Amino acid sequence: MSLSRHALQDAAQRFGTPLYLYDAEELDAALWRVQRAFGDARIFYAMKANPNLNLLRRYAAAGVGFECVSLGELLRAEAAGAGGERMILNGPAKSDAEYAAAARLGATIVVDREEEVVLLPPGSRVLVRVNPAMTVSTHEHLATGTARSKFGLTPEQVPGTLAELRDAGHEVLGLHMHIGSAIEQAEDFTAAFARVTELRAHIGGLSVLNVGGGWSLNADLEGIAYEAHEAARVFGAELWVEPGRYLVASAGWLLTRVVGTKRTGRNFCLVDAGMTEFLRPMLYGASHPLYPMWDALATEVWDVAGPACESGDLIARGVPLPTPQRGHLLLIGEAGAYGASMSSTYLSRPRPAEVLWTGHDWQLLRRRETPQDIWAAEV
């Protein structure tokens, strides 16, 4: 962790808690690691991980494109300064408004099911998503390439769909795949690439092979990149990748304050952030590193619990911490992805502010919501 206690205390005093923090140096370092590993592959940031407009502008200035899964994300990419050639519209259930926006912007559309052939705007530029139907090393809610997944076409459906798209006058670039998120084993990617390349005998060469993202934070990027380039080479295709969590997770933290403790057979450390600010531990069973910003002689085992009136509002269970007291600051690591982007206004709790550490000061990226912001659209 590159942030000092003094800097964190300063952030809490200036912006309050809960508070999302990002480190500009680590954002740049993560992108550099991807660029180094994947070489000349085109990078499209999966903005669902963290769509803050300031981060998007940063990536756009670095030449990164954007993978979008909604009208709002397409418009965010446009607002960040990206042209349509750097946008991909993905998703299993696209709306008419999303098709229209993709056509206006000139974005590449990922065809996720056979009936999309007749729904596409005329002359669309497309990729066809193939589902390799395999089990991967991640939480079931994060696996998108299993046989039971709602995403993509079966390998058997791909040749006919490609032919229909060409007959309909669309520009077919190639194939798309994405097997999940936070995948631990590089072998999963090797197996998925192998299944996709089996299609070469049935569909011929391609202009593009998009292999998605989904790499865990400690993944062997060089090994995955080598296998991905080999798969693209089978088709004679340019390689595209879609990192999301890998680019932003380690560059972000959630700063929360202890509001009290409770001992009722279990020790509860009660903090001012919970499921409304940080849903991943509850939704995916995700484990995140905790950094107590206090010292104490005694260390005990604690459950870290949020303020929501839900039994499942637990950030962590059974973790060793120095004995906490009201007012102490607790830092939650690897929170830059699917943290702020999945925060909600459940219980009419305003969403947190977001700030960036530039190396010498804090830059406000998003102000803290007010209660009035929450009901402003209600009539």
From Swiss-Prot:
Keyword vocabulary terms for this entry: Amino-acid biosynthesis, Decarboxylase, Lyase, Lysine biosynthesis, Pyridoxal phosphate
GO biological process: lysine biosynthetic process via diaminopimelate
Molecular function terms, GO-annotated: diaminopimelate decarboxylase activity; pyridoxal phosphate binding
Pathway: Amino-acid biosynthesis; L-lysine biosynthesis via DAP pathway; L-lysine from DL-2,6-diaminopimelate: step 1/1
Keyword match Amino-acid biosynthesis: yes
Source species, domain of life: Bacteria
Enzyme Commission code(s) on record: 4.1.1.20
Cofactor(s) named in the record: pyridoxal 5'-phosphate
Modified residues (N6-(pyridoxal phosphate)lysine): K48
Chemical reaction(s) catalysed: meso-2,6-diaminopimelate + H(+) = L-lysine + CO2
Active site: C309
Coiled-coil region: none
Pfam families recorded: Orn_Arg_deC_N (PF02784), Orn_DAP_Arg_deC (PF00278)
Keyword DNA repair in annotation: no
Role, per record: Specifically catalyzes the decarboxylation of meso-diaminopimelate (meso-DAP) to L-lysine.
Subunit structure: Homodimer.
PANTHER family: DIAMINOPIMELATE DECARBOXYLASE, GROUP IV DECARBOXYLASE
Protein family (similarity comment): Belongs to the Orn/Lys/Arg decarboxylase class-II family. LysA subfamily.
This protein's name: Diaminopimelate decarboxylase
